[in-house]
A protein has these predicted regions:
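A cross-kingdom feature marking solvent-exposed beta-strand/loop segments within repeated
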Residues: 100-104, 247-267
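Short, surface-exposed ligand- or partner-binding patches at beta-edge/loop junctions that are enriched
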Residues: 91-92, 124-134, 272-286
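A contiguous, surface-exposed recognition patch within enzymatic or periplasmic domains that forms
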Residues: 159-230, 234, 272, 277
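Extracytoplasmic/periplasmic copper-protein system
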Residues: 33, 42, 140-175, 180, ...
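Short tyrosine-centred short linear motifs in exposed loops/low-complexity segments
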Residues: 73-74, 120-126, 213-214, 263-265, ...
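N-terminal secretory signal peptides that target proteins for export/translocation
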Residues: 1-7
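Bacterial N-terminal signal peptides
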Residues: 10-24
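N-terminal, post-signal-peptide metal-ligating segments of extracellular/periplasmic oxidoreductases
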Residues: 20-105, 110-115, 149, 181-220, ...
């Protein structure tokens, strides 16, 4: 057999890489590596909307935990620290990862650290949470958050003019009442850790604003731990809904979309007329306990961070 020259092999390799780029295939050159570290903190925080102190279990002292954002094909090196000052075991479960549960998602004791690596293979918006027992209590007390995996090809869906991240969860006034958690006897349902956090009629509420005809993209995660969310934009219709935030899972012209506990979706809406458009879960027992976020459409909408998720700090 005739051997190929090193020059020909190099040219062939370059052509393969070039074709991969043209086809939008991930390559080691384009993919990035992210070192993500979180600390499990058992802290007393002040509940937004009530002013009451709450004994929370958190990632990095905030509820929800920090938002993680990567691109499809990226590698995530994750480390969780459980400080000696804590009392309970904690763990991490990333719904965006495809790795061994027993090895990587095991609970660690106070004073221990665990690390694992995964590749974000699928685009979307995903839930992450502590899985230590009793998991229902760890989630209810604040150990949850969101990871967004952007598609490697941004042209697979329309470009958003504004992006917001909303994480829905249930809140119990007594975080030690596990029986009430199993009985679904929650006191509030909240967005991003606050009761009526984005309701314009409450003093101190934060604003979700956009200009007419801007495409607003909402990354939505339902942390639960128990209740389904039936997300609806009052006065509007979702232009597009993407199950699990994956551009391949596209629905058009949706009035209300159900997101179960531990699941997520991405919602696009383009509003032509100025006004206020409340975003609610149409499970009214949940909406009327705090899960209402008003989207204000105004020509003078202020510029906002990409994801205006204000930490719920101790």
């Amino acid at each position: 057999m005739k051997r190929q020259s090193p020059q020909l092999m190099a040219i062939a390799g370059a052509m393969v890489l070039a074709m991969a780029g043209l086809m939008g295939l991930p390559s080691q050159a384009s993919a990035k590596t992210h070192d993500v570290k979180m600390t499990a903190l058992e802290v007393e925080i002040v509940t937004e909307g009530t002013g009451k102190k709450y004994k929370a279990w958190t990632f990095n002292g905030q509820m929800p935990g920090p938002a993680v954002r990567v691109t499809e094909g990226d590698t995530v090196n994750f480390t969780l620290e459980n400080p000696k000052t804590n009392i309970f075991q904690h763990s991490m479960d990333f719904h965006a990862a495809e790795i061994d549960f027993l090895k990587n998602y095991r609970a660690i004791k106070p004073g221990e650290t665990i690390s694992f690596t995964f590749v974000a293979k699928k685009p979307g918006v995903f839930f992450y949470h502590c899985g230590a027992a009793p998991m229902i209590q760890h989630v209810a007390r604040g150990m949850f958050g969101a990871i967004i995996v952007d598609p490697k090809d941004p042209k697979v869906w329309p470009k958003a003019d504004r992006e917001f991240l909303l994480v829905q969860s249930e809140l119990w006034n007594n975080p030690d009442d596990v029986e009430a958690m199993f009985g679904r006897k929650f006191d509030h349902v909240i967005f991003n850790g606050g009761i009526w956090k984005y309701h314009p009629f409450f003093i101190g509420a934060e604003a979700l604003e956009a200009k007419p005809n801007e495409r607003v993209r909402i990354y939505f995660v339902n942390a639960g731990p128990n209740e389904f969310s039936s997300l609806h934009p009052i006065g509007e219709i979702w232009d597009n809904v993407y199950e699990s935030g994956n551009p391949a899972n596209k629905l058009t012209g949706v009035q209300t979309y159900v997101v179960g506990p531990g699941s997520a979706a991405t919602f696009d809406v383009v509003s032509e007329s100025p006004g206020v458009y409340p975003i609610v879960t149409h499970s009214l027992t949940s909406a009327l306990r705090g899960a209402i976020a008003a989207l204000t459409i105004t020509p003078v909408a202020k510029d906002a961070p990409l994801m205006p998720l204000t930490p719920w700090n101790p």
